[in-house]
Amino acid sequence: MTKTFRNPQLTKNGELKHLLSIEGLSRDMITHILDTASQFVSLSDSDRDVKKVPLLRGKSVFNLFFENSTRTRTTFEIAAKRLSADVLNLNINASSTSKGESLLDTINNLSAMSADMFVVRHASSGAPYLIAEHVAPHVHVINAGDGRHAHPTQGLLDMYTIRHFKKDFTNLTVAIVGDILHSRVARSDIHALTTLGVPEVRAIGPRTLLPSGLEQMGVRVFHDMEEGLKGVDVVIMLRLQNERMSGALLPSAQEYFKAYGLTPERLALANRDAIVMHPGPMNRGVEIDSAVADGPQSVILNQVTFGIAVRMAVMGIVAGNSDE
């Protein structure tokens, strides 16, 4: 008898109760998140003195960041507070996990404190899935980045940014450049782009930093930066994930910049109205030139701004769905 696979992110009725990965989400579901985020962007842009809505009033959101973060943790905190939630940021270094307590014991203890939602960043791929399997039916889990695996809210805010500036996904060429091998953002972006109907997704980087199987995901692979940038509409730059590298995969940061750094001259090979994106943190002079990062085609700070609205949308949507 064949066992039916059930997406652990979804309720029995197919609604989103956790956000663990973009993989497995339908085009309609991603579009619904982006449309909802658009409403929150409008709220932030309005003249209202109070930017809050009562969607999560009375709910407790626990931010559990087992890896360092600035943008993601801060924007999740702002998003939860704008939804009127009570927010607790757990200091992992001062918590019992630093004393040997297991991840699930930590989650069980926090659940006993009436947690309604966990936002989790962890170095181990799959950690948010493990948590989602063990929480009570009314508790929701959002993956804020797990190992090399996925960073779904970054992928969604990247899609929101692209849609904002380019409108239609179905006539775009998008290039992702850099350390794709170690990048959870790249994986999430690729799944989102292909699901939303982008006809050509390119991966550009040295052989040592590109994973196998990209072609099977519908991605065109380029090892030559200039060739890969020709005629693209969107350039997504990635930093070198030195903390996840083992062994000498690159000769030096300077050599990397010579071969794969995004300079104004290289950007000129893309379409004239191409936009430049970066999930941060940026390493200027390594993967991107300051003239590009701060230039007129850069939408990097827009990504950060849109990230709040996208995370508000995700939290609001999952909070309304459960198997109870």
Curated annotation (Swiss-Prot):
EC identifiers of the protein: 2.1.3.2
Top EC class, one word: transferase
Keyword entries, A-Z: Pyrimidine biosynthesis, Transferase
Binding site for L-aspartate: K99, R184, R239
Pathway: Pyrimidine metabolism; UMP biosynthesis via de novo pathway; (S)-dihydroorotate from bicarbonate: step 2/3
GO cellular component, one term: cytosol
Reaction catalysed by this enzyme: carbamoyl phosphate + L-aspartate = N-carbamoyl-L-aspartate + phosphate + H(+)
Source superkingdom: Bacteria
Residue stretches in coiled coil: none
InterPro entries, A to Z: Asp/Orn_carbamoyltranf_P-bd, Asp/Orn_carbamoylTrfase, Asp/Orn_carbamoylTrfase_sf, Asp_carbamoyltransf, Asp_carbamoyltransf_Asp/Orn-bd
The keyword Transferase appears for this protein: yes
Gene Ontology molecular function: any one: amino acid binding
Binding site for carbamoyl phosphate: R71, T72, R121, H151, Q154, G280, P281
Protein function: Catalyzes the condensation of carbamoyl phosphate and aspartate to form carbamoyl aspartate and inorganic phosphate, the committed step in the de novo pyrimidine nucleotide biosynthesis pathway.
PANTHER family according to UniProt: ASPARTATE CARBAMOYLTRANSFERASE, ORNITHINE CARBAMOYLTRANSFERASE, MITOCHONDRIAL
Family the entry assigns: Belongs to the aspartate/ornithine carbamoyltransferase superfamily. ATCase family.
NCBIfam families recorded: asp_carb_tr, PRK00856.1
Stated name of the protein: Aspartate carbamoyltransferase catalytic subunit
Gene (UniProt): pyrB
